[in-house]
């Protein structure tokens, strides 16, 4: 997931048991493919003449109606609960249904042999927004010990899609599934995103806070069908093992779960 909008000038957990049909997949959920774009590029669709926003790796998609489009889709964008810049009180914005539609047209998902119906786009946006909000709540849970100490709320600086790039944990869990199929799933994540979170630090009570960049890895997995036969999925959210602080946070949570019991689908650090 992780599809937000920002102005160019602006410098594993089950998410609520959300069940979505195959028509409601977020356009940044990629199938593994050797032709997947590099992680620094737009995770939706590249264009030679598009300007790519470095904060969300997205081209500036127009909100105008497409030729041949039958439905009138809303152009209003929803403000998320996720803070954006450390220098302002702005929040990330989600794409409007019309922008989502335009992105799907660019990917060839609508029109011709496309598999997404026009009347499914608004539901896609709702599911997309719901999942991003759930992922952010999981980030806040990880950040809580640091937030309690600094009294500074974290912010989301930027993010990138990495379809087809397996995280070390995803590889390990897949290997465990091959070796111990009765205890672990062999399923690989169908998408991955890396979020760069700004963790607030306060050296003195009277001084303004500073922010430290912390990378989070989000692996998206398909889940079992619900009672209505609709597919579900969950997201494994955790800080990347690229610093001692992150390793400490993950080990602390692992030990807490060993003592009190796991609160999500996996208890590995």
Swiss-Prot record:
Entry annotated with the keyword Iron: yes
GO molecular function: holocytochrome-c synthase activity; metal ion binding
GO CC field: mitochondrial inner membrane; mitochondrial intermembrane space; mitochondrion
E.C. number: 4.4.1.17
Catalytic activity: holo-[cytochrome c] = apo-[cytochrome c] + heme b
Ranges for the HRM repeats: 25-30, 41-46
UniProt cross-references to InterPro entries, sorted A to Z: Holocyt_c/c1_synthase
Top-level taxonomic group: Eukaryota
Pfam families reported for this sequence: Cyto_heme_lyase
PANTHER family xref list: CYTOCHROME C1 HEME LYASE, HOLOCYTOCHROME-C SYNTHASE
Miscellaneous remark of the record: Present with 3870 molecules/cell in log phase SD medium.
Protein name (record): Holocytochrome-c synthase
Organism: Saccharomyces cerevisiae (strain ATCC 204508 / S288c)
């Amino acid at each position: 997931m992780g599809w937000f909008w920002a102005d160019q000038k602006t410098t594993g957990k089950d998410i609520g048991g959300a069940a979505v049909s195959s028509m409601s997949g977020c356009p940044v959920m990629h199938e593994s493919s050797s032709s997947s774009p590099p992680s620094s590029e737009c995770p939706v669709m590249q264009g030679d003449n598009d300007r790519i926003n470095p904060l969300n790796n997205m081209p500036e998609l127009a909100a105008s109606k497409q030729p041949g489009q039958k439905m009138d889709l809303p152009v209003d964008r929803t403000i998320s609960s996720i803070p954006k810049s450390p220098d302002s009180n702005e929040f990330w914005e989600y794409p409007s249904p019309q922008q989502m539609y335009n992105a799907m047209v660019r990917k060839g998902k609508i029109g011709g042999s496309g598999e997404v119906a026009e009347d499914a786009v608004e539901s896609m946006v709702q599911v997309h927004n719901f999942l991003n909000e759930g992922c952010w709540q999981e980030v806040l849970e990880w950040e809580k010990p640091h937030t309690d100490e600094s009294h500074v709320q974290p912010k989301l600086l930027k993010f990138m899609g990495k379809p087809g790039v397996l995280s070390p944990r995803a590889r390990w869990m897949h290997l465990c599934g091959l070796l111990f199929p009765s205890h672990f799933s062999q399923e690989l994540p169908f998408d991955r995103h890396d979020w760069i979170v700004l963790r607030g630090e306060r050296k003195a009570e009277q001084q303004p806070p500073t922010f430290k960049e912390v990378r989070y890895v989000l692996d998206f997995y398909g889940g079992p069908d619900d009672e209505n036969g609709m597919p579900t999925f969950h997201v494994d959210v955790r800080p990347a093992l690229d610093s001692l602080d992150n390793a400490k946070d993950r080990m602390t949570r692992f030990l807490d779960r060993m003592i009190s019991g796991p609160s999500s689908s996996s208890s590995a650090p």
